[in-house]
Amino acid sequence: MIISAASDYRAAAQRTLPPFLFHYIDGGAYAEYTLRRNVEDLSQVALRQRVLKNMSDLSLETTLFNETLSMPVALAPVGLCGMYARRGEVQAAAAADAKGIPFTLSTVSVCPIEEVAPTIQRPMWFQLYVLRDRGFMRNALERAKAAGCSTLVFTVDMPTPGARYRDAHSGMSGPNAAMRRYWQAVMHPKWAWDVGLNGRPHDLGNISAYLGKPTGLEDYIGWLANNFDPSISWKDLEWIREFWDGPMVIKGLLDPEDARDAVRFGADGIVVSNHGGRQLDGVLSSARALPAIADAVKGDIAILADSGIRNGLDVVRMIALGADTVLLGRAYLYALATAGKAGVANLLDLIEKEMKVAMTLTGAKTISEISGDSLVQELGKSLPAALAPMSKGDAA
């Protein structure tokens, strides 16, 4: 199979993975309107082509939280990553490390902090939810700090799990889910051998280490359902600051006022994100929400963005809309499921090449030169026409 883009990895992953795993990462909440708009809105952002600019000394390098990145991309936290490839978190982290970008380990990873951190040279980032079990949160923070994690990514848009209808149809949840998953695995022998058998243990490593006992997929679903905390508030972040003195990034903001609150709190960064369309369907796409947030807090706090990014051109678009760096989620999971570490490494190379083409043809020699001036404006509007707020007629 010829791999020339992230979409090729998606097609390959769909053939390789049991349906319950493919649709778990591929799907979104409810009717998946926001999931689709994340990609569609970003694809409509028109770049301003510039020529004869002598682009021979182009550089993608950037600095974030006193770390040098080879390009403004980090791998996002993704739960169950180790179910998509044998010890998947270790493989993905190795690819990111070799590329010179951060890898973010999820709270609900298969491989625990202590397994992943020693395998890479670059300090990894760690993602944490607000959970009812504050003892687990404190334990996770202490372990992340002991393992040398440099940055905490604190996810705030999940006080309760989103309703993902596709999961019930695919076997991730719903009637007879365990039996359905078993037969799907049997029908996908490559995955069953490489991951199902040889990728064990299939614990949620960070949780197992705290509870002192193995936790399987059913435990994952049950534990999360019982532990997400709808009482989350800024006081919880103040509590976390007692145990974490490194950079803290608040993930899951879509409103400028929430971004201003993050600045007032003293966060080091925010992630403009709708959780990849997996939480509340019908909210703004990240691309549509980003410009107003950038107008409100650009320069006061680091702005990261995710949701809908599929290639290097999308990275440039997000930066032009106001992001400093992006997080890559689904795209790297498809590559990981297809070819492990080599797949993720190749995807990152493709993104780098696509970014260089986009920057060369928009006249931006450095990441700092990508801005709103890189976008095509219409009638003097401050937003690209495709992302301007909908009128009442459009909304109807």
From Swiss-Prot:
One GO cellular component term: plasma membrane
Binding site for FMN: 106, 127, 155, 251, 306-330
Catalytic activities: (S)-lactate + A = pyruvate + AH2
Domain FMN hydroxy acid dehydrogenase: 1-380
EC number: 1.1.-.-
Keywords: Cell inner membrane, Cell membrane, Flavoprotein, FMN, Membrane, Oxidoreductase
Active site annotation, chain numbering: 275 (proton acceptor)
Gene Ontology molecular-function annotations: FMN binding; L-lactate dehydrogenase activity
Pfam families: FMN_dh
InterPro entries: Aldolase_TIM, Alpha-hydoxy_acid_DH_FMN, FMN-dep_DH, FMN_HAD, FMN_hydac_DH_AS, LldD
GO biological process terms held by the UniProt record: aerobic respiration; lactate metabolic process
Enzyme class: oxidoreductase
Localization per Swiss-Prot or TrEMBL: Cell inner membrane
Residues where substrate binds: 24, 129, 164, 278
Protein topology in the membrane: Peripheral membrane protein
Cofactor: FMN
Biological role stated in the UniProt entry: Catalyzes the conversion of L-lactate to pyruvate. Is coupled to the respiratory chain.
Similarity remark: Belongs to the FMN-dependent alpha-hydroxy acid dehydrogenase family.
Annotated NCBIfam families: L_lactate_LldD (NF033901), PRK11197.1 (NF008398)
Name used for this protein in its record: L-lactate dehydrogenase
